[in-house]
């Protein structure tokens, strides 16, 4: 699958997911996840941050980690077209690749 198919970019679709999507909170990681099934044949991802999340370098690193973990778990989501939005709230949070990978594993089981 091409990289551009993974990203969720339409403002209208993003607002629809925030309104109609299922909310899952991960209180130990200070992050929320919104998910909703879509009309496409593949799943898409968006990682967004609160305004209190400072530092573009750290923000982009966390975004890259989420996208890579999602890309690796994409074959487990085959047949289930889902739009997923992660909202990260705390910039002092120490998100490692392994914690994000385990989060994606649990996501696949939940969905």
From Swiss-Prot:
InterPro entries: Ribosomal_Su5_D2-typ_SF (IPR020568), Ribsml_uS5_D2-typ_fold_subgr (IPR014721), RNase_P (IPR000100). The keyword Protease does not apply. One of its GO terms (cellular component) is ribonuclease P complex. It is an enzyme of class 3 (hydrolase). Keywords: Endonuclease, Hydrolase, Nuclease, RNA-binding, tRNA processing. It comes from the Bacteria. NCBIfam families: rnpA. Consists of a catalytic RNA component (M1 or rnpB) and a protein subunit. Belongs to the RnpA family. RNaseP catalyzes the removal of the 5'-leader sequence from pre-tRNA to produce the mature 5'-terminus. It can also cleave other RNA substrates such as 4.5S RNA. The protein component plays an auxiliary but essential role in vivo by binding to the 5'-leader sequence and broadening the substrate specificity of the ribozyme. This is Ribonuclease P protein component. It comes from Borreliella afzelii (strain PKo). The lineage of its organism: Bacteria, Pseudomonadati, Spirochaetota, Spirochaetia, Spirochaetales. The gene is rnpA.
